[in-house]
Amino acid sequence: MRSGYTLPVFACAGAIAALHWLRQRQSIQVALVDLIEPAQIAEVPIEQVAGLSANMALAITRSDPGDNLDLTKNTPIWAVVEWGKTGGEQVTIKGGEGIGKQVNADNQAAIYSYAQRLLQANLTRLLAPEESIIVTIILPEGRSLAVRTSNSAFGVVEGLSLLGTTGISQPLSSPDQLDAFRSELQHKASLYESLVFCIGENGLDLARKIGINAEKLVKTANWLGPMLVEADALGVKEILLFGYHGKLMKLAGGIFHTHHHLADGRREVLATHCALAGLSKQDIEIVFHSPTAEAALKHLKALDISTGNDWVNQVYSAIAETIDSRCQEYMQSHSSRGTAATICGSILFDRDRKIIVKSKTACNLMGNLC
């Protein structure tokens, strides 16, 4: 299956093409982008370039994520570049229409660290020391596409995120991609005894921000079961599962491939642990019928405020412990190492990227991962 590039790469290519027009008053058909991660140069087709004024230009590219079931496939990405004030910040990056806003970060544009680095690195080298530019990224279809994503669950509204830790987009649901994840795991298992599994980019990004060693992070996508078994077979001593609660809690129900097309079980896991914690029948029913895990968490938080109880901690601590024990059982059932099987801990975070709970094992593992 063919890989492609992530959205930040196309945004950067458009900005390079628009800046070229400002300098040369000429269009280019291909922009060369240094991906940084990985260390390679991408040749990105430019669909259109136009001067909007003497000091402003627009370039358009189209997303090509490869053979990936990605809703951004073929969506246009616009980059508007204008000259800034002499002596100002060399590259100022803004989010325009269709770029999401982070509701818990003063509505900042959802242009995350890799995209920022990519744009800064590629554009700064094209500027003289005294020059500065303002780059505005626009996704004309971003607002409508965002409705079909889980962005709002992570506090991003009104558009898509320029998210990612690499310039390469891989087909995450394909067996070939599992092979790629296993290959990365095999490499890191040869270097470290303790590793962190993250399902997606939000986990990878937050893990770095709380001080976890980036070299110990391994992306799993939805393939948690096979990756846990592989880690155990490789002799990894400790695995920390670090992820969004709406994904990781599925493991507490014995679901080890977390794609929603295969199985869900979130409301059953939540309602069961609420019942075990002693919530009222009425509150258990509200949790069970909540449309999302985030809505259920919101109800538990409201209960804590109104009653002075600590239901969030009680329920989620129990879920985290169940995740740990289910993972241990799963690995041991596939392991030839017996009681020496890999130790597993879990950390769950919410849509605001705030940690809800760390299991007891996770707390013990953290010292080996930072």
UniProtKB/Swiss-Prot annotation:
Which HAMAP family does the entry link to? CbiD (MF_00787)
- Keyword S-adenosyl-L-methionine set for record: yes
GO: which molecular function terms? cobalt-precorrin-5B C1-methyltransferase activity
Pfam families referenced in this protein's UniProt entry, alphabetically: CbiD
InterPro entries linked:
CbiD, CbiD_sf
Q: Which reaction does it catalyse?
A: Co-precorrin-5B + S-adenosyl-L-methionine = Co-precorrin-6A + S-adenosyl-L-homocysteine
What's a GO biological-process term for it?
A: anaerobic cobalamin biosynthetic process
* Methyltransferase recorded as keyword: yes
Q: Which domain of life is it from?
A: Bacteria
Hey, which pathway is this one from?
Answer: Cofactor biosynthesis; adenosylcobalamin biosynthesis; cob(II)yrinate a,c-diamide from sirohydrochlorin (anaerobic route): step 6/10
In Swiss-Prot or TrEMBL terms, this protein is called Cobalt-precorrin-5B C(1)-methyltransferase
Annotated EC: 2.1.1.195
What the entry lists under SUPFAM superfamilies is as follows: CbiD-like
Species of origin reads: Nostoc sp. (strain PCC 7120 / SAG 25.82 / UTEX 2576)
Family classification: Belongs to the CbiD family.
Q: Which cysteines are joined by disulfide bonds?
A: none
Q: Which UniProt keywords apply?
A: Cobalamin biosynthesis, Methyltransferase, S-adenosyl-L-methionine, Transferase
PANTHER family listed in its UniProt record:
COBALT-PRECORRIN-5B C(1)-METHYLTRANSFERASE
